[in-house]
Amino acid sequence: MKVALLAGGTGGAKLAAGMQAVVGDGLTVIANTGDDIETLGVYVSPDPDLVTYWLSGQVDEVRGWGIKDDGFDVFQRMARFGAPDWFGLSNLDLAACLYRKDFMASGGRLTDAQAQITRGLGVRATVLPMSDQPVRTRIKSSGEWRGLQEYLIIEGGQTEVEGVQLDGIEEAEPTPELIEAISSADLIVIGPSNPVISIGPILA
């Protein structure tokens, strides 16, 4: 059985792990990339990586995100040097993000970089970014537009949301792999993820 799951965030990632236990490599997760951000010299893809960590059994289940038993030594040392310290990345998380940055800087696609990461972590399912073109979710609050991660982490997600926009969505296209996953699926599932910032960018 082939299942295509649209997901982003912890809820969708947990469902993906449960589905993989049932359908194995018949599962394809189409993950939101509107949260993606470049920081500390690396390319961070939070939702695809969160899904990957749940699927590989490496996630910190207490927090619901990140890698269990992983430290922040590299991040903390970089912060001592004056690097931005608002977006924390653990050691193994940094490794994935550094690999992705280097892979894409050499001309590789985001889709292929994620495939290498999932394969390296022994994931049976397929994890596809929603597009290889950059899409960035931006939030308007207190009269200013800012990236989603800045809003959630720096602002704490506490100020009233006045607007949401997806920068780059008009240029973004689905990949051949994504189209194949949808067209060949016996079942298409929209995961229990935030409908505006996780599912919305995928459907847009």
Labelled PLM ranges:
Residues 202-204:
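Charged helix-capping and loop-helix junction motifs
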Residues 185:
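An anion/phosphate-binding loop that grips the pyrophosphate of nucleotide cofactors and donors
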Residues 167-173:
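Short gly/ser/thr-rich secondary-structure transition/capping motifs
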Residues 14-27:
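A short, Lys/Arg-enriched amphipathic alpha-helix followed by its capping loop at the start of a domain
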Residues 10-11, 30, 193-197:
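Short glycine-rich anion-binding loops that position phosphate/pyrophosphate groups of nucleotides
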Residues 21, 32-166:
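Electropositive, gly/pro-rich neighborhoods at or near active sites that engage anionic ligands
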Residues 11-16, 37-40:
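Short N-terminal binding/cap micro-motifs at the start of the first secondary-structure element
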Residues 1-4:
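Extreme N-terminal starter segment of soluble prokaryotic enzymes
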